[in-house]
Structures are given as structure tokens and as C-alpha cells.
A protein has these predicted regions:
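Acidic, PIN/NYN-like endoribonuclease modules and their adjacent C-terminal/linker elements
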Residues: 1, 99-132
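Short, well-structured N-terminal submotif of metal-dependent ribonuclease cores
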Residues: 1-38, 49-58, 114, 132
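Residues that scaffold the ATP/ADP-binding catalytic core of kinase and kinase-like folds
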Residues: 11-13, 45, 119-120
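Alpha-helix C-capping/helix-to-loop hinge sites
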Residues: 28-32, 49-52, 67-70, 87, ...
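Active-site-proximal, substrate-binding regions of enzyme catalytic domains
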Residues: 45-71, 83
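Active-site neighborhoods of divalent-metal-dependent phosphate/nucleic-acid chemistry enzymes
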Residues: 70-115
Length: 132
């Protein structure tokens, strides 16, 4: 099982250019790890897509419904904060929470974020499924 960041979930749920790669990362069982903040991040990204007229509000609503039905293991981020802060010079605090979770559960972090995938000081495998 992988840790997936919001970029992968948005691509999977909204049917972006790299949907097939995102689907493969999540797997047939639609099971993955993510920090609990993932719902807010995905919701905000879908909002941006609607405002940019890249997807319809109806499609975004359906994507949010699908997100809530996924077998996503949402992990409270309270115990991830310290490690995320230690990574502040390499990645954003949000990304640090995903990295800290991947390190904690000893699973690869899957992302579409090239900058995150090339960050230094991470103690986990980061798999870039497509450059963003």
C-alpha cells in the first residue's frame, strides 16, 4: 500500500492527463494512506479546477463523493507534525506531513510533484508518476 498525496488523488478523481498512472498508484482496491488533511487539500484543488473552468462543479462534486467512498486510511497528523517541521527547508509543511507519514508506515510516497520527488533529506522512497 502506498502513501498518496493530493496531486495523485485529484488526478485520479477528476480524470486528468495522468489518470491511468494515478489509478495504478492507488490500486484496484482503492486503498492507500494519507494524512487526514488530504480531504481539505483535494477539495481545494477541485475548487481551483472548477474556478479555472477545467472541470464542472458537478464533476467536482462527484469527485468529492468518490473521495469519501475510497478506502483511504486517513491518519491524524498530530504525530507527524514534528517530522514535517524538520523537513521545512526541503518541502512545504503540507508535503512534510505526507513524507512523515510515508516514513512512519514505511511505504512509498507517490506524487505528481517533481519538486517533492527531488527533495533532499527524505527517509522514504518517493515515486514520481508523472512530472507536474
Amino acid at each position: 500500500m502506498n502513501v498518496v498525496d493530493a496531486s495523485v488523488l485529484v488526478e485520479y478523481l477528476a480524470g486528468g492527463e495522468h489518470e491511468a498512472a494515478a489509478t495504478h498508484a492507488i490500486g484496484r482496491e482503492r486503498w492507500a494512506w494519507a494524512p487526514a488533511l488530504v480531504d481539505a487539500e483535494v477539495g481545494n484543488a477541485l475548487r481551483r479546477l472548477v474556478r479555472a473552468e477545467k472541470i464542472t462543479a458537478r464533476k467536482a462534486g462527484a469527485a468529492l463523493d468518490d473521495l469519501l467512498l475510497m478506502r483511504l486510511q486517513r491518519v491524524p497528523h498530530r504525530h507527524l507534525v514534528e517530522r514535517a517541521w524538520q523537513l521545512r527547508d526541503s518541502v512545504s509543511f503540507y508535503d512534510g506531513l505526507y513524507v512523515a507519514l510515508a516514513e512512519t508506515v514505511d511505504a512509498p510516497l507517490v506524487t505528481l510533484d517533481k519538486k517533492l520527488a527531488s527533495a533532499s533529506g527524505l527517509r522514504t522512497e518517493v515515486e514520481l508518476i508523472a512530472p507536474a
